[in-house]
């Protein structure tokens, strides 16, 4: 802390300066492999193109319940943010990122995001449902779909899932007033196959599972993110480098980002403008030495 009371984070300054010099060395405007989901950097390989088409169809056709699953780090959240950005003037949306709550807490958060109530408003459940129905009817008159996205839906309590299902009863004779997208890890599919969720499963009319990128898509993904960051077509990673990254990451976007970022940092330190497979191998070996292959991957993937 300085004499005038300001807190100084020297480690933060060091990290910022390294990142700044790393970008300057490779002539980039942004960090190409940031772990934060950013729709501007989305790469639509064959699988993600198909997933986006399924989601778009589900919303436009007012299908009600939509299910999207994929492994940790497969790009689900980034894909959804891209969907919302593309349709920001066509739909009203609420994004629930922490579904570990009671139904009333989740419902209040949904209504708050739609500006129907203030969070501290003291209304009974029946009044909340009435207000939500009025809101949905108003949006329906304007032909504006309303969608609620539950991220990490495998964490929703079983009793809460049943109450969420009841919201699908908010409909007219012609259309569903509310669209809901359940996004989660593969466990979500297993949960919804349980007999107790038969009615909910029957209402899911659109479902898609995101699989990892292929080797070819992994290379295209890396080059796409570099170009968005300002590489302008300059090849920084060789084919052998992309092959090594694919072998370690198994095509999981988050792991691709982690290894690619670490490799570019190593390249900056070693003043290597072109990164080959040998450099990637060294970086991967260092990652494995730190925590071991399985624990390393698990730790990185769990930090969504």
Q: What are the language-model segments listed below?
A:
Residues 6-8, 12-62, 294-304:
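A short, basic N-terminal segment
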Residues 30-33, 90-92, 101-120:
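Conserved NTP-binding/hydrolysis module of P-loop NTPases
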Residues 61-82:
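Walker A/P-loop nucleotide-binding motif
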Residues 83-86, 188-203:
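Short regulatory helix/loop adjacent to the ATP-binding pocket of P-loop NTPases
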Residues 96-100, 192, 205-218:
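Conserved AAA+ ATPase "SRH/arginine-finger" region at the nucleotide-binding site
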Residues 102-106, 117-163, 172-175, 213-218, ...:
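Mid-core helix/loop region of P-loop NTP-binding domains shared across ATPases and GTPases
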Residues 112-114, 186-187, 195, 216-232:
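Conserved AAA+ ATPase "sensor/coupling" helix adjacent to the nucleotide-binding pocket
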Residues 227-304:
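C-terminal alpha-helical "lid" subdomain
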